[in-house]
């Protein structure tokens, strides 16, 4: 009777030993460290975030440079600034003369024919250009002297023709600056873009748990929208104003005003303004993607939560 019970005991011990051995081997195999898909995803995410920040910084600097370039058009001849103008008043009579108008400054160019000695033939042309930083001065006589005196013209005949040209074009140039091409929209856009860019870069280093942080972010978003709208208004305003002056569509380039006087649009200025709008849009879009990637809720949840935190203080201020 006792024989079957004694024979079953070793079998149970063997099975238990097999189970223990299996557990030990399992521990050894799982002890090795392997690269998980989540770690690879984190590396890719950090690389994408760095690229986005780099794109934001580059677009921010490029937009600021273009904005300053637009505002300083026709202020001086350095960096080809005299080629960035809104409109040009020109004549092609005995001497080719032109007056280019920017938001603040203006440039005059005079082309003379130089004769080769002992031949009497026209050998070449010489163009003299000078710019003034402020074309909005009230005294036209002083303004005309500041424009033509540094040119160092060769004959008194050219000076007389240039003075007649200024008597006709300077009042029109001042009218264009004061009543057609307003300097306020591009100037306010540049200031708002500079301020909102700094606010957004500072917000990247903060935390979304503080209400002051979210209030600053909402303010930056509102000012950013206004800045982008001003950039768009500037380029469309320049295009529509010149279309009205030329009495043509965007493809028209020049119109005769009478007495061999012409007005033409500044195509380079229009191109730079369009590029500025595109770069500003890229900057704000990139910054939006950067902030959306920081929150698991996504962009809509992030903005809604920020507005909810600001809505309470605004209601209290309205009640007061």
Curated annotation (Swiss-Prot):
Disulfide bonds: none annotated. It is a multi-pass membrane protein. Glycans are attached at residues 92, 122, 154, 167, 247. GO terms for cellular component: membrane. One of its GO terms (biological process) is terpenoid biosynthetic process. The keyword Membrane applies. Keywords: Glycoprotein, Membrane, Transmembrane, Transmembrane helix. Part of the gene cluster that mediates the biosynthesis of an ophiobolin family sesterterpenoid. This is Uncharacterized ophiobolin family sesterterpenoid biosynthesis cluster protein. It comes from Aspergillus terreus.
């Amino acid at each position: 009777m006792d024989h079957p019970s004694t024979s079953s005991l070793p079998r149970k011990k063997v099975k238990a030993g097999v189970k223990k051995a299996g557990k030990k081997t399992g521990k050894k195999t799982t002890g090795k460290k392997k690269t998980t898909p989540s770690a690879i995803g984190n590396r890719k995410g950090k690389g994408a975030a760095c690229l986005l920040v780099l794109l934001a910084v580059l677009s921010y600097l490029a937009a600021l440079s273009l904005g300053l370039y637009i505002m300083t058009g026709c202020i001086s001849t350095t960096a080809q600034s005299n080629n960035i103008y809104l409109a040009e008043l020109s004549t092609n009579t005995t001497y080719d003369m032109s007056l280019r108008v920017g938001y603040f400054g203006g440039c005059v160019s005079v082309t003379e024919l130089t004769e080769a000695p002992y031949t009497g033939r026209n050998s070449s042309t010489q163009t003299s250009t000078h710019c003034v930083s402020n074309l909005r001065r009230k005294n036209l006589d002083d303004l005309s002297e500041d424009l033509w005196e540094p040119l160092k013209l060769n004959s008194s005949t050219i000076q007389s023709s240039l003075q007649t040209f200024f008597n006709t074009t300077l009042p029109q140039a001042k009218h264009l600056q004061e009543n057609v091409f307003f300097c306020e929209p591009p100037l306010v856009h540049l200031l708002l873009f500079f301020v909102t860019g700094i606010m957004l870069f500072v917000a990247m280093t903060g935390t979304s748990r503080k209400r002051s942080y979210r209030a600053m972010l909402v303010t930056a978003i509102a000012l950013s929208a206004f800045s982008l709208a001003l950039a768009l208004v500037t380029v469309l305003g320049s295009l529509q104003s010149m279309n009205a002056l030329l009495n043509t569509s965007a493809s028209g380039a020049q119109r005769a005003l009478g007495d061999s006087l012409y007005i033409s649009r500044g195509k380079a200025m229009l191109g730079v303004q369009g590029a500025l709008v595109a770069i500003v849009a890229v900057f704000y879009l990139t910054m939006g993607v950067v902030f959306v990637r920081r929150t698991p809720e996504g962009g809509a949840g992030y903005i809604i939560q920020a507005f909810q935190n600001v809505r309470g203080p605004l209601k209290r201020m309205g009640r007061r």
